[in-house]
């Protein structure tokens, strides 16, 4: 599965931010630093598909060829974590509804409903364009599907699918009543159509752990389906290329042990909080190593310095990045990647790294 003869070392690269002179200088610096893997183009869906079914890959062709000419492999990411504005505007059903019942607007990345059929249709379509174009490119080391799954949604589509999921899981409303112990507080159901999602509108997310647990299981299954929607397309064109997605470390949003059953290799992002003790980071590494029975894993992201999203974003001390990287490799990572290779000039993550 592995093309390089040593640990993959590199990170996310977003060349659509830079001019040709900057990119050429980056290639020189990458070679000097011993970089041998770049992940791209994670957030570039809007540039690659400026309108529905209209694709522009020429700029990406040029970048990938330039990277390969410098002896660097690529981890190609389907850019489906950040849908274009035209998709959200034309098909508002792709946007999630939050736990307060509010329809979210376009803007944030990972702001899509994993159960939206239109989202899955367009995500599979651009994944196929990637696969047709790059599945046998000599630079391709692995695929990276979307980015940091974990958005909850409470839209009508999710409501309907949750009822179907419960029907399949329990078979009858009588069994559902038994498992959820609905006799307490007079919550007895007479039909699956009476089931509602656990939101702030009914406070079930706080006061009914059985409903909340099943909802979280449902979200995990729905997310796995959404991932497989792209995975199957990519595998069809070249089954030899491993496929992963990056998980956000130790989170309870998704059952990672279920999600990783569908991955060829585990990937996760290591962003320790300032007050995290070293053993907590070590535990996260061990969890990732254990998800595929001890198989080595991909450290898909870590910051070369500060984050930009924690309450207190401290600078790393001299040598700390090296120690964090060594810790990952000691726990079984065979890939050490950063976000990102050149700090953004502007935008949402300007102060990251």
Per-region residue spans from a language model:
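Surface-exposed, active-site-proximal loop segments in enzymatic domains
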Residues: 44-58, 86-117, 157-159, 206-212, ...
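Hydrophobic targeting/anchoring helices
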Residues: 105, 244-353
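Aromatic-lined substrate-binding rim segments of carbohydrate-active enzymes
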Residues: 24-104, 128-131, 229-237
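Polysaccharide-binding and catalytic clefts of secreted carbohydrate-active enzymes
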Residues: 100-265, 269-283
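Boundary/entry segment of secreted carbohydrate-active catalytic domains
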Residues: 1-22
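Short, well-ordered coil/turn segments that N-cap beta-strands
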Residues: 4-9, 34-36, 68-74, 136-141, ...
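Conserved, mostly hydrophobic/aromatic
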Residues: 11, 30, 38, 67, ...
